[in-house]
């Protein structure tokens, strides 16, 4: 690819630039249109009149239009989302009302279940009580009989044995005494008779002596016969053992005690069994006493609910963002006119400055046109090219800049940047909308809380009323059934006390005043009293604990499952009872808004990808230019002798009119690739090129000239130091506003 091609030297000769002009036109003085003159091109004021349609203002207005379209679409999407959310809310409201009315529908079944449970429990309890009462009755009677019979046996053993021994001792003592007294009396009589005989003999001797003295007395007689007769008549009274026999005959058999105790013990048991038998088939739980909660009608989709407030807030945010975007972008579009006006003024000056290059014949006309028509991109190319060494690389760098900054390429880049800026504006708006989505989620969670609260209130009221019925049932059963149990325990306790008292009375009547009374009372307390106390303690425990207590219904009977469902929302893959199965969002209502925001986000992402692709396409163009320039930079061009062409621009040198005809087009001019200093020092408009033709077959001068010549053979158009030439332009502005250049006369 050649950047500037000219007619090869083998072509027919053409007159050099300006050869056909008269001598005075070969170096014409720069001329400009007078102020106010009509020109076919736009003047300074005309250019300023179109500042308002500069590219940046237009781009900002296009961005504004795209943002307004996005805002309109977002409003439409939010309106659609609101309709869907309200529809979903209505469905949730209906489902929530149905759930809140669950106690109404479930209470009948639960009430029937509770009533049946109570009936079966009471019937089973009565059957058990009937069997238990009968068993306890027989056990108590048996135990009391065991105690009384045992005590009777012990008393009979102790008292009868003692009395029989005592009677035997008394009888033996009486027999022994009667026999002994007879023998003693007979012995005494014999002793007294012998003693009396001896006394009489003794007295007879004494009387014989006394008769000698003249007196005689009769001896006294010892007469104890009467006393001995009394002694013989001593006998133990026959009534000595009558008391013992009476005691033996009066030992109680406790038949009356047993009969009294049995009757007293069996009476309460009979009454309890009678009551149980009467109530066993008659008990029927009254189901009408159970409460039935009313149906619930929830309403959280009205005018003052969170959904309308959420979408109202979203609409307010969108409206505010729309106003902000309109104000900012319009202000930016208007503000862009100021720097663009300054740039247009500068461009106009540069164009007038560089327009003088067109009149010079020592520059590539195409390059000059490019510099004049694209002042900023060409200036950028010149600036960047100045970083490299003079020569082909500078030309290639300028060509890269020119290739990447063509009008289509810049339009592509500007379109991509504007698209990204539009996406950024839409993303800001979408971010503001998405920030409010958690608020809707909170509102929806409050819907669930409302459902659970209503459900919990209904469940609690039902549980309170049901528990009151259960408490009344407990009291009724405790009074009708266990009331007799308490009465029976009290009666049995009293009966045992009466039994002990009656037994004590019998013993007092029997052994009162005897030595056996104390031991028998001790035996009674040890054998019966301690046992009776144990029975009384047991009866007291039965009295204290003999009552039925059916369990109450918990307050969360109908709301427990809903509460657990909400509690499980914080776990992985939650599925709220307000959400449809398979929803990945918190609930169906939030899913509507999330779906809309995700659709808008996908659209923004698509636009961003398209804009990025446009920018990437511009970079691809830049890469193509760089690769092409690198290829040309490192490729050696063929010399003319090998079939190559001279790609270097050689402007004709200004000559006199008479010399034009003698100049051949085939002459080769030694044109340096860099700017040549002005030898005259007059600040020329542009660098001058050497017009010394190469003399074929002659010497080229020094080796340096030879190297320059070889380098210049491969030159390209546009390698001239235009920037230096332009910098050397001395311009000024006259009082009338006309731009005058350094070469102009003042």
From Swiss-Prot:
Keywords: Cell membrane, Conjugation, Glycoprotein, Membrane, Transmembrane, Transmembrane helix. Glycans are attached at residues 178, 248, 277, 457, 486, 493, 508, 555, 570. Residues 1-32, 682-708 are annotated as: Disordered. It is a multi-pass membrane protein. The keyword Membrane applies. It is found in: Cell membrane. It comes from the Eukaryota. GO terms for cellular component: mating projection tip; plasma membrane. Residues 1-50, 160-323, 422-606 are extracellular. One of its GO terms (biological process) is plasma membrane fusion involved in cytogamy. Residues 72-138, 345-398, 628-746 are cytoplasmic. PANTHER family: PLASMA MEMBRANE FUSION PROTEIN PRM1 (PTHR31030:SF1). Belongs to the PRM1 family. This is Plasma membrane fusion protein PRM1.
């Amino acid at each position: 690819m050649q950047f500037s091609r000219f007619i090869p030297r083998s072509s027919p000769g053409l007159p050099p630039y300006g050869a056909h002009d008269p001598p005075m036109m070969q170096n014409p003085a720069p001329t400009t249109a007078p102020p106010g003159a009509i020109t076919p091109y736009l003047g300074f004021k005309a250019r300023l009149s179109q500042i308002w349609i500069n590219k940046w203002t237009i781009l900002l207005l296009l961005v504004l239009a795209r943002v307004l379209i996005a805002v309109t679409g977002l409003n439409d999407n939010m309106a659609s989302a609101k309709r869907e959310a309200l529809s979903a809310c209505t469905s949730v409201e209906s489902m929530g009302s149905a759930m809140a009315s669950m106690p109404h529908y479930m209470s009948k079944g639960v009430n029937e279940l509770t009533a049946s449970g109570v009936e079966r429990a009471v019937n089973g309890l009565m059957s058990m009580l009937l069997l238990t009462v009968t068993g306890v009755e027989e056990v108590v009677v048996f135990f009391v009989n065991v105690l009384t019979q045992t005590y009777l046996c012990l008393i009979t053993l102790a008292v009868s044995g003692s009395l029989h021994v005592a009677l035997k001792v008394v009888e033996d003592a009486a027999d022994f005494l009667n026999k002994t007294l007879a023998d003693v009396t007979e012995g005494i009589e014999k002793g007294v008779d012998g003693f009396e005989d001896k006394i009489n003999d003794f007295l007879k001797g004494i009387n014989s002596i006394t008769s000698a003295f003249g007196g005689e007395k009769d001896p006294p007689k010892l007469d104890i016969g009467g006393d001995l007769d009394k002694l013989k008549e001593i006998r133990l009274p026959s009534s000595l053992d009558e008391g013992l026999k009476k005691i033996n005959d009066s030992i109680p058999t406790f038949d009356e005690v047993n009969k009294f105790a049995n009757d007293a013990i069996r009476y309460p048991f009979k009454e309890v069994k009678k009551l149980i038998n009467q109530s066993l088939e008659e008990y029927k739980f009254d189901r009408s006493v159970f409460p039935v909660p009313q149906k619930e009608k929830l309403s959280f989709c009205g005018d003052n609910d969170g959904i309308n407030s959420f979408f109202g807030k979203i609409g307010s945010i969108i409206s505010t963002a729309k106003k902000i975007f309109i104000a900012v972008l319009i202000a930016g579009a208007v503000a862009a006119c100021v720097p663009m006006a300054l740039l247009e003024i500068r461009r106009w000056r540069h164009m007038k400055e560089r327009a003088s290059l067109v009149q010079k014949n020592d520059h590539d006309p195409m390059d000059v046109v490019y510099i004049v028509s694209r002042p900023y991109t060409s200036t950028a190319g010149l600036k960047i090219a100045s970083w490299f060494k003079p020569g082909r690389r500078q030309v290639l760098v300028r060509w890269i800049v020119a290739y990447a900054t063509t009008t289509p390429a810049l339009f592509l880049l500007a379109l991509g940047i504007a698209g990204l800026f539009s996406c950024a504006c839409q993303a800001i708006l979408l971010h503001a909308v998405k920030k409010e989505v958690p608020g809707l989620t909170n509102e929806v969670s409050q819907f669930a809380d409302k459902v659970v609260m209503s459900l919990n209130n209904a469940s609690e009221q039902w549980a309170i009323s049901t528990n009151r019925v259960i408490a009344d049932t407990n009291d009724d059963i405790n009074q009708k059934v266990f009331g007799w149990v308490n009465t029976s325990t009290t009666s049995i306790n009293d009966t045992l006390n009466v039994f002990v008292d009656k037994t004590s009375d019998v013993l007092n009547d029997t052994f009162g005043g005897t030595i056996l009374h104390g031991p028998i009372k001790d035996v009674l307390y040890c054998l019966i009293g301690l046992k009776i106390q144990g029975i009384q303690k047991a009866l007291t425990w039965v009295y204290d604990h003999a009552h039925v207590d059916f369990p109450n219904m918990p307050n969360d009977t109908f709301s427990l499952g809903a509460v657990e469902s909400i509690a499980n929302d914080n776990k992985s893959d939650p599925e709220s009872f307000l959400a449809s199965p398979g929803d990945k969002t918190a609930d169906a209502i939030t899913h509507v808004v999330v779906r809309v925001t995700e659709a808008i986000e996908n659209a923004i992402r698509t636009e961003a990808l398209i804009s990025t692709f446009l920018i990437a396409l511009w970079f691809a163009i830049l890469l193509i230019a760089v690769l092409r320039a690198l290829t040309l930079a490192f490729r050696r061009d063929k010399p003319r002798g090998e079939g190559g062409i001279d790609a270097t621009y050689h402007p004709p040198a200004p000559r006199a009119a008479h010399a034009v005809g003698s100049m051949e087009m085939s002459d080769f001019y030694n044109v340096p690739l860099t700017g040549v200093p002005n030898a005259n020092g007059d600040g020329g408009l542009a660098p001058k090129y050497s017009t010394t033709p190469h003399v074929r077959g002659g010497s080229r001068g020094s080796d340096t000239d030879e190297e320059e010549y070889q380098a210049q053979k491969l030159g390209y158009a546009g390698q001239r130091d235009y920037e230096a030439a332009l910098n050397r332009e001395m311009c000024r502005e006259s009082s009338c506003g006309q731009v005058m250049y350094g070469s102009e006369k003042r």
